[in-house]
A protein has these predicted regions:
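Catalytic cores of the polymerase beta-like nucleotidyltransferase superfamily
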Residues: 1-196
Length: 196
């Protein structure tokens, strides 16, 4: 069992490679190479890798509750590799979001930083926003918030993500863009039918 949804209470070595790989987070990380037998892939990792899919090994609720950081790792892999998260895995991520409260701020910051720097950051955070809203709840109000302005054709959240995706690959710039309109829904006003 795991302590605080992060660390195993104890580590037990197993003699079976299959059993060892079964304990991994995602199928793409649950493969091994044997110099005589070649690729050992019991859980479809190669197919998921080739198809660009992030999928938990076995029961996704069990994998994510063992180590809640896996929720943010799935998001990071989706961003870095420009992969999709398999629907059952994403639904389990959403069900287990509250476990992120057990994760240290340093680990969350590390995963968020890598996510923001990924080549697929727009699609990852647009398609799978809930983990971001759990760790930065102030951003939730931007999702779907229409700006009603001819200079802003996207809602605040999509505008934010497009800004990040089109910015230089500089973490400070991307962090600034993540927060640059976070307060807009709270101070929005209209004058002559135009949003400000």
């Amino acid at each position: 069992s795991y302590v605080n949804s992060r660390r195993p209470q104890s580590v037990t070595f197993v003699a079976s490679l299959r059993e060892d790989l079964r304990r991994r987070d995602f199928t793409i990380n649950a493969m091994a190479w044997n110099h005589t037998g070649g690729l050992m892939d019991y859980f479809g990792g190669r197919e998921d890798l080739e198809s660009g899919i992030i999928r938990c090994v076995g029961n996704p609720d069990e994998r994510l509750s063992e180590d809640a950081l896996r929720i943010l790792r799935a998001l990071r892999f989706a961003s870095e590799k420009d992969f999709r998260i398999e629907p059952d895995t994403y639904m389990a991520m959403r069900r287990n979001l509250s476990l992120l409260r057990n994760i240290s701020a340093e680990r969350i910051a590390y995963e968020l930083s890598r996510t923001l720097m990924g080549k697929g950051v727009f699609s990852a955070l647009m398609n799978y926003p809930e983990p971001l809203f759990e760790i930065i709840p102030e951003l939730r109000a931007a999702f779907g918030f229409k700006q009603n302005n001819p200079h802003h054709i996207y809602d605040v959240y999509e505008h934010t993500l497009r800004s990040i995706a089109n910015a230089d690959a500089d973490l400070e710039i991307r962090l600034a863009l993540l927060f640059h309109d976070a307060g807009k829904p709270l101070c929005y006003s209209e004058k002559e039918g135009i949003g400000h």
